[in-house]
From Swiss-Prot:
CDD domains: ATP-synt_F1_beta_C, ATP-synt_F1_beta_N, F1-ATPase_beta_CD. F-type ATPases have 2 components, CF(1) - the catalytic core - and CF(0) - the membrane proton channel. CF(1) has five subunits: alpha(3), beta(3), gamma(1), delta(1), epsilon(1). CF(0) has three main subunits: a(1), b(2) and c(9-12). The alpha and beta chains form an alternating ring which encloses part of the gamma chain. CF(1) is attached to CF(0) by a central stalk formed by the gamma and epsilon chains, while a peripheral stalk is formed by the delta and b chains. Keywords: ATP synthesis, ATP-binding, Cell inner membrane, Cell membrane, CF(1), Hydrogen ion transport, Ion transport, Membrane, Nucleotide-binding, Translocase, Transport. This is ATP synthase subunit beta 1. It is found in: Cell inner membrane. Its main location: membrane. It comes from Albidiferax ferrireducens (strain ATCC BAA-621 / DSM 15236 / T118) (Rhodoferax ferrireducens).
Length: 474
């Protein structure tokens, strides 16, 4: 601890400037806090985190909480440690904020184990690449952009195309069937969604309200209404809890909703810290900040972290620096398309834009690979023919092209699926489709075994057998 040797008390400084969430604090010149040290405001629960050393004993900090009421001259003490948050099984079933303080009105988190939210990423020789597939039960994902156990997945989409609903369905299908533990970090999203998620988890038994220790998920929220410091650091708090479980040898699912808000909070803080903005107004340190977070989300020889991250795409522009920087770190990218959503096909995943490193015959097998590529080839051909159809109509197409279009439209509809978490809105029960059934269904459509069925029979069904049943009623 950075202690004053005479009085054996923590080193104190005083506030000399406040600009929004950024606070400058003056300390004795020979006892300046280190970068990332947490400072406590005397007589208040407010924590400040050191970002820059300006010289002459002055450090520039960001406030992890509201800076209302701060003024020059207030005393601040240096804890001489980074932000420390509770980790381990005591966090299960609890909702915490960026500092690890519980916000679920169920008393304090009773644990002796605390960890710093800043730590180095595992070294190269500690890493453990995984080839094992993670079945999600969602046809379009399992077919064209399969997830790897211990991999990183991004759900990309603009406003209102279904990122959070897809995330909730993945949690429903994976976290409930998953024997390991989950950590959910709500980064700058709506408080209502955090509340819905908590109740959904409680109803399904993933959060055990009678005995919290038997819960399987820990939740960390820093929502939209909170200051930028909270939104910037809350992803690290959630990650620290996930890393702690991983280092105990567990397989962890780490959900982040939404990584874009993490970048945006960094942009707000960066401007207040006086850094010159770079492209589109983002912080100049965007790639480094993103890299520091993403490099820690990884699997080691001890345990695995499988991460699923929602990524908001501003103005549906995937070349925007924030989503573009995120792309580089992911194993699978699930791109949600407004065009597909406007056709009423949900999940609105674009099978031609979504990718996965796992879609390799050596990993998924020849059968799966060939079926996925045949589906993408059929859809790509349909996309090329759409201009001709729009100008000349279907009648001008060659017979084989007419057949391709008919199959592509069936594939498009068969890629839709009723979700468990959307039962309230759709009125139809959710479907979980196994990978084997998914491959069988698409193989039959591509091979022409379903050419006699009307295309509406394929809309919002689970397996191919359900499409045959539905066709009988049409």
């Amino acid at each position: 601890m950075a202690q004053d040797t005479q009085t054996n008390t923590a080193v104190q400084g005083k506030i000399v400037q406040c600009i929004g969430a950024v606070v400058d604090v003056e300390f004795p010149r020979d006892q300046m806090p280190k970068i990332y040290d947490a400072l406590k405001l005397e007589g208040s629960a407010l924590t400040l985190e050191v970002q820059q050393q300006l010289g002459d004993g002055i450090v520039r900090t960001i406030a992890l909480g509201s800076s209302d009421g701060l003024r020059r001259g207030l005393m601040v003490s240096n804890t001489a440690n980074p932000i420390m948050v509770p980790v381990g099984t005591a966090t299960l079933g609890r909702i915490m904020d960026v500092l690890g303080t519980p916000i679920d009105e169920r008393g304090p988190v009773s644990t002796e184990k605390y960890a710093s939210i800043h730590r180095k990423a595992p070294t190269y020789d500690e890493l453990s690449p995984s080839q094992e597939l993670l079945e999600t039960g969602i046809k379009v994902i399992d077919l064209v952009c399969p997830f790897a156990k211990g991999g990183k997945v991004g759900l990309f989409g603009g406003a209102g195309v279904g990122k959070t609903v897809n995330m909730m369905e993945l949690i429903n299908n994976i976290a409930k069937a998953h024997s390991g533990l989950s950590v959910f970090a709500g980064v700058g999203e709506r408080t209502r969604e955090g509340n819905d998620f908590y109740h959904e988890m409680a109803d399904s038994g993933v959060v055990n309200l009678e005995n919290l220790g038997e819960s399987k998920v820990a939740m960390v929220y820093g929502q939209m209404n909170e200051p930028p410091g909270n939104r910037l650091r809350v992803a690290l708090t959630g990650l620290t809890i996930a890393e702690s479980f991983r280092d105990e040898g567990k397989d962890v699912l780490f959900f982040v909703d939404n990584i874009y808000r993490f970048t945006l909070a960094g942009t707000e803080v960066s401007a207040l810290l006086g850094r010159m903005p770079s492209a589109v107004g983002y912080q100049p340190t965007l790639a480094e900040e993103m890299g520091r977070l993403q490099e820690r989300i990884t699997s080691t020889k001890v345990g695995s972290i499988t991460s699923i991250q929602a990524v908001y795409v501003p103005a549906d522009d995937l070349t925007d620096p924030s989503p573009a920087t995120t792309f580089a770190h992911l194993d699978s990218t699930v791109v949600l398309s407004r065009d597909i959503a406007s056709l009423g096909i949900y999940p609105a995943v674009d099978p031609l834009d979504s990718t996965s490193r796992q879609l390799d015959p050596n990993v998924v097998g020849q059968d799966h690979y060939e079926t996925a590529r045949a589906v993408q080839g059929t859809l790509q051909r349909y996309k090329e023919l759409r201009d001709i159809i729009a100008i000349l109509g279907m009648d001008e197409l060659a017979p084989e092209d007419k057949l391709t279009v008919a199959r592509a439209r069936k594939i498009q509809r068969f890629l839709s699926q009723p979700f468990h978490v959307a039962e309230v809105f759709t009125g139809s029960p959710g479907k979980y489709v196994s990978l084997a059934e998914t491959i069988r269904g698409f193989k039959m459509i591509v091979a022409g075994e379903c050419d006699h069925l009307p295309e509406q029979a394929f809309y919002m069904v689970g397996t191919i057998d359900e499409a045959f049943e539905k066709a009988k009623k049409i």
